[in-house]
Amino acid sequence: MALVDYGGSSSSASEDEDCTENIQTPALITLKRPALPKAATLLGPKKPKPEEFVEDVVDDPAEHGGRMRSFKHERGNWATYVYVPATACVDQLEEFQTEAIARLEPHLELQPNESLHLSLSRTVVLQYHQIDEFSRSLQSALNSSAGFAATLQGLRIYTNEERTRTFIAAPLDAAFVEKMTAILQPIDQVMLDYRLQQFYDPASFHVSLLWCVGDQETLLNEKLTELKELLDDQDKLCLAVNEVHLKCGNKDFTYSLK
């Protein structure tokens, strides 16, 4: 689009040499140059990058099994957490999920956790422009962390902070809590550096297997012995702690441990 060049205008001196001295030359008239339109007016508002664009979401618990968000979904907010994947024993855990759902079906409507992992952070919120820098900080913090082979042991019942959901989980064997805490500490420091909430204190490392809506802690504790019998049929539940993952929305970063 070509911009119009608004020049100033003035009256010229008389070109007629015969003009008498009694005729006065008109005073110069200065016109102000009109202000050019701003770029936003011509080009429209700045468009977000494709990665930043997230449609406004109206949270409807009916669309995801009655779950409620712990924080409001807003454009530019990326739900973020750090975890260790439970890939080494995923087949055994999925078999337990199927058997437990069938066993408790008359009492509760249980849902399986689809991404089986051991959390090393709370779910926090990052802005899009923070993600890469946060990932680099986390990678640097974990550079000296050593991996190890661990196991899961038994079952335990948890609720979320709002007590709107109840979980059946397999805790980390107590023999490996100290080593897992050594990995957690630099992660907590990164969270602190970014003014984000640190992990629970005291930490309770576990892999969530099943969940249901509402506070069903009492009922599930009554069924815990029965559920443990299902898990006892499984071989040792191994957990390979050789890498840590960062999940930011649909982005996943992996950091190998020594």
Curated annotation (Swiss-Prot):
Organism of origin: Drosophila melanogaster
**Into which EC class is this enzyme placed?**
lyase
Q: Where is this region: Disordered?
A: 1-20
Family to which this protein belongs: Belongs to the 2H phosphoesterase superfamily. USB1 family.
Catalyzes what? a 3'-end uridylyl-uridine-RNA = a 3'-end 2',3'-cyclophospho-uridine-RNA + uridine
Q: Where does AMP bind?
A: H117, L118, S119, Y200, P202, A203, S204, F205, H206, V207, S208
Q: Which GO terms describe its biological process?
A: U6 snRNA 3'-end processing
Which residues fall in a coiled-coil region? none
Q: What does this protein do?
A: 3'-5' RNA exonuclease that trims the 3' end of oligo(U) tracts of the pre-U6 small nuclear RNA (snRNA) molecule, leading to the formation of a mature U6 snRNA 3' end-terminated with a 2',3'-cyclic phosphate. Participates in the U6 snRNA 3' end processing that prevents U6 snRNA degradation.
List the protein's name.
U6 snRNA phosphodiesterase 1
Check the record and name the InterPro entries matching this protein: Cyclic_Pdiesterase, Usb1
- Which keywords label this protein? Hydrolase, Lyase, Nuclease, Nucleus
Which GO terms of the cellular component aspect does the record hold? nucleus
